[in-house]
UniProtKB/Swiss-Prot annotation:
InterPro entries: HemC, Porphobilin_deaminase_cofac_BS, Porphobilin_deaminase_N, Porphobilinogen_deaminase_C, Porphobilinogen_deaminase_C_sf. GO terms for cellular component: cytoplasm. The lineage of its organism: Bacteria, Pseudomonadati, Pseudomonadota, Gammaproteobacteria, Vibrionales. GO terms for biological process: protoporphyrinogen IX biosynthetic process. This is Porphobilinogen deaminase.
Length: 312
């Protein structure tokens, strides 16, 4: 790659994916005036298989694989991901090299009739495709009917507006980025619904031997966000977490100290194993591993073993 070669960003075609790609393009060009950046749009399996729950068709990696193949084959230089959709493992030669500043990590309650979860009547229908959200909702309100909800943000809002659901739960970050914040009736605090690993953060994946690109991406990295997400992902990696499993986690920084909360649960909310850990940010990944092992010892291993057996 020469200095004048355009940087090619592989991206899905959904509005949110395109927002993220343009966000990185703009940030790169702001940091390096005159740099040429192109978007290479593509369709992934996750965009095609919309009639089946994610947990049954292989999880969130479905949204990433085609982008990774494009990078490995030299058709693209980098891919931009919503961190909550990034699998724990990367193909050889690729890596997560940059994590941008985190947007709001909370879940959002969206409804045309009700202001929050507490206002929902008995047996109300709530839409989500996330086992993590389902598990925490069912623990708090066992009477609620959880109905599968797939598609991009606009599709999901359309289904709500068509009357298929009393409410839906979406990531607040996505609604804010698409300038749809007015659709949010209330935010669900982490104390009530722990977010997904890395929720609200945008990550950049590229070939780890592309030294020119690594240098260009350096100004986009947000160290506070990177430390928090590394902590959450280390926990998830130790749990071997994927889309098939209700895992929530959220870390906060206070100076150089990091506080990580996490949970593993049964999809029906009948059992949730929770834990938390505090330590120095330099030990972010070790803390994530330690908390994961504590969760496993306290009952998460049994939940995970059962869930993975069900999906084989």
């Amino acid at each position: 790659m020469t200095q004048s070669t355009p940087i090619r960003i592989a991206t899905r075609k959904s509005p949110l994916a395109l927002w993220q790609a343009h966000f990185v393009k703009d940030a790169l060009q702001a940091a390096h005036p005159g740099l040429e950046v192109e978007l290479v749009t593509m369709v992934t399996k996750g965009d095609i298989i919309l009639d089946t729950p994610l947990a049954k068709v292989g999880g969130k990696g479905l949204f990433v694989k085609e982008l990774e193949v494009a990078m490995l084959e030299g058709r693209a230089d980098l891919a931009v991901h919503s961190m909550k959709d990034v699998p724990v493992d990367f193909p050889e030669g690729l890596g997560l090299v940059t994590i941008c500043e985190r947007e709001d990590p909370r879940d959002a309650f969206v409804s045309n009739t009700y202001n929050n979860i507490d206002e929902l009547p008995q047996g109300a229908v709530v839409g989500t495709c996330s086992l993590r959200r389902q598990c925490q909702l069912k623990e708090y309100r066992p009477d609620l009917v959880i109905k599968e909800l797939r598609g991009n943000v606009g599709t999901r809002l359309g289904k709500l507006d068509a009357g298929e659901y009393d409410a839906i739960i979406l990531a607040a970050a996505g609604l804010k980025r698409l300038e749809l914040e007015e659709r949010i009736r209330s935010f669900i605090e982490p104390e009530q619904s722990l977010p997904a690993v890395g929720q609200g953060a945008v990550g950049i994946e590229c070939r780890v031997d592309d030294e020119r690109l690594l240098k260009l991406l350096e100004p986009l990295n947000h160290q506070d966000t990177a430390d928090r997400v590394r902590c959450e992902r280390a926990m998830n990696l130790t749990l071997e977490g994927g889309c098939q499993v209700p895992i929530g986690s959220y870390s906060l920084l206070d100076g150089d100290n990091i506080w990580l909360r996490a949970l593993v649960g049964e999809p029906d909310g009948s059992l949730i194993v929770r834990g938390e850990i505090r330590g120095h940010r330099n030990d972010a990944e070790a803390l994530g591993v330690q908390l994961a092992n504590e969760l496993l010892e306290n009952g998460a291993r049994d939940i995970l073993t059962k869930l993975y057996a069900d999906h084989e």
